[in-house]
Swiss-Prot record:
Its cofactor is NAD(+). GO terms for biological process: L-homocysteine biosynthetic process; one-carbon metabolic process; S-adenosylmethionine cycle. Belongs to the adenosylhomocysteinase family. Its main location: cytoplasm. It comes from Nitrosomonas eutropha (strain DSM 101675 / C91 / Nm57). SMART domains: AdoHcyase (SM00996), AdoHcyase_NAD (SM00997). This is Adenosylhomocysteinase. Binds 1 NAD(+) per subunit. It is found in: Cytoplasm. Its EC number is 3.13.2.1. One of its GO terms (cellular component) is cytosol. It catalyses: S-adenosyl-L-homocysteine + H2O = L-homocysteine + adenosine. The gene is ahcY. Substrate binds at residues 67, 144, 204, 234, 238. PANTHER family: ADENOSYLHOMOCYSTEINASE.
């Protein structure tokens, strides 16, 4: 896709981007302006730090859903002194007007809604292509799901041992491995050179964090990482309250289905599953939960949900939502047994939770973008949303701005910390200190009209606390 600048900015031409339509930039800019009023954390960081430029010299390779809210994050990073190159971390999650607005500010972005897998991995390479002669390269990664980090690490391993990309296990790996092989031929040593320049990564989501901890455990983590996901002001807000609003938004935009009276199955009762269950119950659905963890299963039961297995539920429920981060949670056999017109969707990061590959052999009927009928030989149909990828971003616009402000404020603080103090960190996975977590929360209270009670000196002494926090021990679970 070619890119020519819309005359919104200086009538100049900016070609270091791949977006759907730069004429959408004005629309994107108007929505960004609205989002900024709902993102007090990011705006406070701009006000506090823009004059100090704490990210000056940072060249951030960003791989995160290219939404309106992400545009506010990108422009905050730039305001704090960083250079940025950006791609989306999902082929369906880009909001094209958001990407256009960022490109119109001469910020390199490579993303459009409905990318092919080949384009997705091409764009993942592009965020590391700082200069054609290699004189500058990315020195920080901001990741969501871990694909940008994976690309450099796997590519570097393949430089030493090509057999690591010899046997793909699925379609996505086929495309990724082919992309790496092509780069190994055209640019020998490209991956290891880029990897060597990275100071650290900040990771947004549960799935990507899991990858980082696995690498740390094996001694394969090449640089320090900050686990943004497990900041309380991310996981207990974005994952819970964000999904509570965006799941139903995606299902309703896609299908116009009446939720009330339906049986809905949520696979997984972590923070994401809890938010999904609340939203569906709030609209009148009977909600069932599947779980492997006895603690989460007990929580679900104590909240009044029925805890079942997919084998029990697959032929009875009307709506199925996966929220586990696992693979093949909904199998071919489960889908064969589902009711006619059952709705099947996923809100976990990757598309592995529903075994979509196993039903590709049947007839597919596209209803509209990201909404498909799978027609079985019996004539029964199920409705698959976003091809098993993130339903809230594929079929809607993701989480609301306010809750993303909380998550993204953590991201900016994590980038600042690693950029300024990365040499003090070992090649391990870290979380931000609780004092910063509480600061992020404080930045968002005023928007909601919240007034905090302040401890008296006597009370603080009694509790053995600093009056200004932190207020809870590290192990406190909220």
């Amino acid at each position: 896709m070619s890119a020519t600048i819309n005359p919104v900015v200086d009538n100049s031409v900016f070609t270091d981007c791949e977006v759907a339509d730069l004429s959408l930039a004005d629309w994107g800019r108007k929505e960004i302006a609205i989002a900024e009023t709902e993102m007090p954390g990011l705006m406070a960081l701009r006000e506090q730090y823009a004059g100090k430029k704490p990210l000056a010299g940072a060249r951030i390779a960003g791989s995160l859903h290219m939404t309106i809210q992400t545009a506010v994050l990108i422009e905050t990073l730039v305001a704090l002194g960083a250079e940025v190159r950006w791609a989306s971390c999902n082929i369906f999650s880009t909001q094209d007007h958001a990407a256009a607005a960022i490109a119109a500010r001469d910020i390199p972005v490579f993303a459009y809604k409905g990318e092919s897998l080949k384009e997705y991995w091409d764009y993942a390479h592009q965020i590391f292509e700082w200069t054609s002669d290699g004189s500058h390269a990315a020195n920080m990664i901001l990741d969501d799901g871990g694909d940008a980090t994976l690309l450099l690490i796997l590519g570097s391993r393949a430089e030493r041992d090509p057999s690591v990309i010899a046997n793909p296990s699925n379609e996505e790996e086929q495309v990724l491995f082919a992309s790496i092989r092509s780069r190994l031929t055209s640019h020998p040593g490209w991956y290891s050179r880029n990897l060597a320049g990275i100071r650290g990564v900040t990771e947004e989501t549960t799935t990507g964090v899991h990858r980082l901890y696995e690498m740390e455990k094996k001694g394969e983590l090449p640089f320090p990482a900050i686990n943004v996901n497990d900041s309380v002001t991310k996981s207990k807000f974005d994952n819970l309250y964000g999904c509570r609003e965006s799941l139903v938004d995606g299902i309703k935009r896609a299908t116009d289905v009446m939720i009330a009276g339906k049986i809905a199955v949520i696979c997984g009762y972590g923070d994401v599953g809890k938010g999904c269950a609340q939203s569906l119950r709030g609209l009148g659905a009977t909600v069932w939960i599947t779980e492997i963890d006895p603690i989460c299963a007990l929580q679900a039961a104590m909240e009044g949900y029925r805890v079942v297995t997919m084998d029990d539920a697959c032929d009875k429920a009307d709506i199925f939502v996966t929220a586990t981060g696992n693979l093949r949670v909904i199998t071919h056999d489960h889908m064969l047994k589902m009711k006619n017109q059952a709705i099947v969707c996923n809100i976990g990061h990757f598309d592995s939770e529903i075994d979509i590959a196993s039903v590709q052999k049947y007839q597919w009927e596209n209803i509209k973008p990201q909404v498909d009928h799978v027609i079985f030989p019996t004539g029964r149909r199920i409705i698959v949303l976003a091809q098993g990828r993130l339903v809230n971003l594929g079929c809607a616009t993701g989480h609301p701005s306010f809750v993303m402000s909380s998550s993204f404020t953590n991201q900016v603080l994590a980038q600042m910390e690693l950029w300024q103090n990365g040499k003090d960190y070992q090649k391990k996975v870290y979380v931000l200190p609780k004092q910063l977590d509480e600061m992020v929360a404080r930045l968002h209270l005023g928007k909601l009209g919240v007034k905090l009670t302040e401890l008296t000196d006597e009370q603080a002494h009694y509790l053995n606390l600093d009056k200004n926090g932190p207020y809870k021990p590290e192990m406190y679970r909220y």
